[in-house]
């Protein structure tokens, strides 16, 4: 026996249990996607066991009318729109019949890729504009706001690499904190209805520069919410599978090179979600937001990075690849804190989305 094919309904428990059993067999594991209402009538093929399958839970999908209707006929500006999350936000929004999408990023290659992808898929049915600018350049951003007068601004522009930001803290503050404040000031000036910020679990009790800057961004956004001119909300989520600079591409490169696979500590655990899940969470939380909320997602059980590395090596069918510990980096946590404690959270109409109860500080205090 050389291959094992999973042709099962998407049941978290069963899939995880069977995977644990069969991964010891040295057989290649493939998946035949089980027919569902959405895939009925479509051609299905055998596929490789992908990284997303290692979450062993159903993908989170948004199909509620409230979210879909909220973005219809709106002009939406996405900063950092060429990045992993930003580009997926563009893909998701394109399905929601917006009046116009403006993709803004300083990284032109990422913007170009998503622009071409959406043009090919939607053609003239989608009003799509691209602007190359940095959120740290307020004058350039002002030109963009004057040109488009967006209804909704989603701020996904940020420096996110923890080790790099430890050594480049001035740039982290300049881009993440002051850049976010630039965007918020312009939102007020140009009468934007809603500002939504992409945040991170590293903003909870931060131990590194990147997390501290994102916590500052949350506080700034909440302080602007108290002024009543722009509705503001923030959305926290954990590590995103396959995003640029994440551990998954690193492990893939190391496995392809024959090893070793390096991780800082075998005890590290992280919450994970897919890029589409993270993007949909941002969009749904924005649609249900009132003003000043920090949203967090129940992402299920955290995953050991060591187990993830072992599973990736197993899926690659590579032999004799060693896993080496390199030691925790400055500011790195063994355990990320996302939901903190359930008694600190309020529920929402979505069972997977919660709101932190912490009261925002005033604009004067932030200043």
Predicted regions and their residues:
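Flexible, Lys/Arg-rich cytosolic regulatory linkers and terminal tails that connect or flank
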Residues: 15-75, 188
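Proline-aspartate-enriched helix->loop->beta-strand connector
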Residues: 1-4, 98-99, 145-154, 162, ...
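Conserved Rossmann-fold NAD(P)-dependent oxidoreductase catalytic core, especially the SDR/UDP-sugar
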Residues: 23-28, 32, 39-41, 155, ...
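N-terminal Rossmann NAD(P)H-binding glycine-rich loop of SDR-like oxidoreductase domains
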Residues: 76-96
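Conserved Rossmann-fold cofactor-binding substructure of NAD(P)-dependent oxidoreductases
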Residues: 129-152, 331
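Conserved glycine-rich Rossmann-like NAD(P)H-binding loop of the short-chain dehydrogenase/reductase
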Residues: 98-113
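Strand-loop microenvironment adjacent to phosphate/nucleotide-handling motifs in alpha/beta enzyme folds
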Residues: 2, 26, 66-68, 219, ...
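A solvent-exposed beta-alpha-beta segment
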Residues: 1-37, 109-113, 121, 128-129, ...
